A protein has these predicted regions:
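N-terminal secretory signal peptides that target proteins for export/translocation
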Residues: 1-11
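C-terminal motif of bacterial Sec signal peptides marking the signal peptidase cleavage site
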Residues: 24-27
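N-terminal segment of the mature folded domain
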Residues: 33-151
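A bilobed periplasmic-binding-protein/Venus flytrap-type ligand-binding module shared by bacterial periplasmic
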Residues: 129-137, 266-275
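Ligand-binding pocket segment of bilobal, Venus flytrap-like solute-binding proteins
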Residues: 171-240
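Extracellular/periplasmic juxtamembrane helices and adjacent flexible linkers that interface
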Residues: 268-321
Length: 321
C-alpha cells in the first residue's frame, strides 16, 4: 500500500470514528431529554377521583368541559371520600380529587418530602347535607339536638337514619364531626346503603326513614330526574340558630351561601400536577366563570365568584304538615 493510500485510509478511519462519536453523543442527549407530557391544558386524558356525593354536578362540569375541548377526556371515578384521598396519596395515575376538605399541614409536608412539590388545593363551592324524609311523612322539622340524639341512639322513635355507607364517606364524617361533635353514632339506628341514589330510593320506599344526602342529588328544581324524585321524598327543615325571620330553614341556595342552613360544607379540589396539563385546564374551567355558573345553576354556592344576593319580599310561610 502506498503512502497516499495509507493516508487516505487514516483519514477515512478518523472520519468514521468522529461520526460514530457524534452519533453516540447525539443519542445520549436525546435520551436525557425529559419526555413531553401526554396532555395539555385542553387535550389528553386524565383520571380523577370524586366524592360520590358530588356526582351530579361534577358530571355536568365534565360534560360541558369536554364539549368545549373535544381533545380532552376526563375519566371520573366516583367513590367514598376516604378512597379518593387514598388515590391522591398512593396512585400516581390520579391527577386530581374532588372532596370535602383540603390538605392538612402534615399532608402537605408528606407530598413535599415525597414528590418535591405540594399539590394545590382550595374550595370551589359550598355544598350542604340535606335531611330528606318520605313524601308521606309528617315529620319534617329537625333541630340539631334532635339529630344528635337520634344518631347517638338516645332518642328512640322507631325511625332509621340512612347513610351512603357506615364508614369512609364524607356524609358519615360530617355527621360525626359536625352533628355528633366527634362521638360515634349508634349503629343500631342507622342503616348503610351503597350510594346517594340508594339513600333516595330507600327513603322513597320507607315512610319511617330519614336520609342524609348531598344537596347536589336533590336540590336542583331544574333537573327533571331530581324533580321526579321530589314527588317521592321531601327536604326537611333544619333549625337555624341565628335566623330572626324563621327558626327553621331548608337548604336552598340562599341559605347555603349565607350559611343560615347549618349543615353546610365545602367542595374542594386537590390537584397533583406541577405543569400546565389537563388537570390545570380542568381546574381553570371549574374556578372561573363557566364552571362557577354551573355550580350556581346546580344550586350550590359558588366560592370563586361573587354573586349578588338581593333582599326581596315574598309571601311564604312554613307549611304545616
Amino acid at each position: 500500500m502506498s503512502t497516499d493510500q495509507r493516508k487516505g485510509w487514516a483519514i477515512l478511519k478518523t472520519t468514521l470514528i468522529i461520526f460514530w462519536i457524534a452519533l453516540i453523543i447525539s443519542g445520549c442527549k436525546q435520551g436525557s431529554q425529559p419526555a413531553k407530557p401526554a396532555d395539555t391544558l385542553t387535550g389528553g386524558t386524565i383520571n380523577i377521583s370524586v366524592d360520590e356525593s358530588f356526582k351530579p354536578v361534577i358530571d355536568e362540569q365534565i360534560k360541558v368541559f369536554e364539549s368545549s375541548f373535544p381533545q380532552a377526556k376526563i375519566i371520573a371515578h366516583y367513590k367514598p371520600e376516604a378512597d379518593c384521598l387514598k388515590d391522591i396519596f398512593k396512585d400516581s395515575a390520579t391527577r386530581m380529587v374532588i372532596v370535602t376538605r383540603g390538605l392538612s399541614g402534615k399532608e402537605e409536608k408528606f407530598f413535599k418530602d415525597s414528590i418535591n412539590f405540594t399539590p394545590r388545593w382550595d374550595e370551589l363551592a359550598t355544598d350542604a347535607i340535606c335531611v330528606i324524609v318520605n313524601s308521606q311523612s309528617k315529620d319534617t322539622i329537625f333541630t340539631l339536638e334532635r339529630l344528635q340524639k337520634q344518631l347517638s341512639g338516645s332518642m328512640e322513635n322507631g325511625q332509621q337514619i340512612i347513610f351512603d355507607g357506615l364508614s369512609a364517606t364524607s356524609t358519615v364524617r360530617f355527621a360525626i364531626d359536625s352533628i355528633l361533635k366527634g362521638k360515634r353514632f349508634d349503629t343500631s339506628v342507622v342503616r348503610a346503603v351503597t350510594s346517594s341514589q340508594a339513600v333516595l330510593s330507600y327513603v322513597a320506599a320507607n315512610e319511617n326513614a330519614i336520609g342524609l344526602v348531598g344537596i347536589s342529588w336533590i336540590g336542583n328544581p331544574e333537573d327533571t330526574v331530581q324533580t321526579k324524585m321530589l314527588k317521592k321524598v321531601k327536604m326537611a327543615y333544619v333549625e337555624c340558630s341565628h335566623c330572626t325571620d324563621s327558626p327553621y330553614v331548608k337548604p336552598n341556595q340562599l341559605n347555603i351561601m349565607t350559611r343560615r342552613y347549618p349543615l353546610v360544607r365545602g367542595l374542594f379540589y386537590i390537584l397533583k400536577e406541577n405543569y400546565a396539563g389537563l388537570g390545570s385546564g380542568f381546574l381553570n374551567f371549574l374556578q372561573y366563570e363557566r364552571g362557577q355558573l354551573i355550580f350556581r345553576r346546580a344550586y350550590l354556592g359558588p366560592s370563586k365568584m361573587g354573586f349578588a344576593i338581593r333582599n326581596v319580599m315574598i309571601n311564604q310561610k312554613l307549611k304545616k304538615e
